[in-house]
């Protein structure tokens, strides 16, 4: 798809205040590490994740989403009556019914004119929501949308630590499906999607994008809730191989739609999984690793928040500059990939 007149404004990353280093996670896993004689430092060594962030107390996804949404509206100069569509796009949600967007709407005090819905597609949700909102902007159905996401990985990480320490039947082999859980973090992200003539200076222009799906891999990473607790198991090796193969196919489609090639983007922002994933992805796509802007070393994997938060941080830190073109390479379990071409202004 090609976008003619749609931009992102007020893009923000909402970072929780509590920092958990990978060393701290391993200290909490001392019973497991001692029993299986696991070497200390392996978590950071294998992933490149030095730390991740959590909120210090339980927080509903709607509250995290609204924290980011409020800041995005302020940054974009948008009031409650200006939002025609609100999308909550994270993996985490308050409950099955009603939509988490209903709670975000109330927390932000949006007007009755705003449509609400949740878009859920694992770690790809935010990019999916942006593309859907952009399509509605381009067609004239809406003028502005607010896309929000709020992820809280703390319950998953804490449950995983407890399970790994308490289940004495686990071995070095059988702990592998739980390893990816220890890379998860928390955070929020939000942006206003609108027509370009309604946005102020500094907006990010959406140029186009492409998507690709491989549902044969839908069993490689599965998460669920059980009695208010989160559970996730991942075949990390198979997921890495299938994910990179899917990304290669999507990259080919993306280049055909946008007219870009490997030399076009000044910067590349991918879903933030870890060092090995990024290295293999850049190798297989033929991209220059020097163009990679990462946040996983300090944020871990923050689900749907990872790509928008990383883009927001790159801009805020001056690592992504006005006039530069950026390839946003998203992927989520399922497997699904979406890649968007944007230009910072």
Predicted features, each with a name:
Residues 1-58, 168-241, 249, 331, ...:
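Condensing-enzyme catalytic core mediating Claisen C-C bond formation in acyl metabolism
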Residues 9-12, 89, 120, 145-151, ...:
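Short beta-strand segments
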Residues 62, 66-69, 92-94, 106, ...:
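Claisen-condensing/thiolase-fold acyl-transfer catalytic domains that form or cleave C-C bonds
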